């Protein structure tokens, strides 16, 4: 899906790692939430409250998911899932455009 209809967008940005990771929150009528953002090259560690699906729209990164010993390469057009209540690491190689979906009650 390349666009969203009938949504509420929170104007204030979510800013992490001194501005190297930024996003905007999108709220849907059914109560679901997504963020659209940009990852600058660098290494990042994030925790999750809910299950997350990270769709990389453009760019290139490595991700290490919970329980994995090796890094997986992710490029534009690919996605990965992160379990709720866990941590994951990203090593962003090229500026990456992403959409993160938060999956409730997982």
UniProtKB/Swiss-Prot annotation:
Keywords: Glycosyltransferase, Transferase. It comes from the Bacteria. Gene3D superfamilies: Jelly Rolls. GO terms for cellular component: cytosol. GO terms for molecular function: guanosine phosphorylase activity; purine-nucleoside phosphorylase activity; pyrimidine-nucleoside phosphorylase activity; thymidine phosphorylase activity; uridine phosphorylase activity. It is an enzyme of class 2 (transferase). InterPro entries: Ppnp, RmlC-like_jellyroll, RmlC_Cupin_sf. It catalyses: a purine D-ribonucleoside + phosphate = a purine nucleobase + alpha-D-ribose 1-phosphate; adenosine + phosphate = alpha-D-ribose 1-phosphate + adenine; cytidine + phosphate = cytosine + alpha-D-ribose 1-phosphate; guanosine + phosphate = alpha-D-ribose 1-phosphate + guanine. Its EC number is 2.4.2.1, 2.4.2.2. The keyword Transferase applies. The keyword Glycosyltransferase applies. Belongs to the nucleoside phosphorylase PpnP family. Catalyzes the phosphorolysis of diverse nucleosides, yielding D-ribose 1-phosphate and the respective free bases. Can use uridine, adenosine, guanosine, cytidine, thymidine, inosine and xanthosine as substrates. Also catalyzes the reverse reactions. This is Pyrimidine/purine nucleoside phosphorylase. It comes from Leptospira interrogans serogroup Icterohaemorrhagiae serovar Lai (strain 56601). The gene is ppnP.
């Amino acid at each position: 899906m390349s666009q969203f209809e009938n949504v509420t967008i929170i104007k204030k940005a979510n800013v992490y790692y001194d501005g190297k990771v930024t996003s905007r929150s999108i709220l849907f009528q059914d109560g679901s939430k997504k963020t659209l953002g940009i990852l600058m090259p660098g290494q990042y560690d994030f925790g999750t409250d809910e299950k997350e699906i990270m769709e990389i729209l453009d760019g290139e990164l490595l991700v290490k998911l919970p329980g994995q010993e090796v890094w997986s390469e992710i490029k534009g057009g690919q996605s990965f899932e992160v379990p709720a209540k866990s941590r994951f690491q990203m090593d962003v190689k090229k500026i990456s455009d992403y959409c993160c979906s938060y999956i409730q009650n997982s």
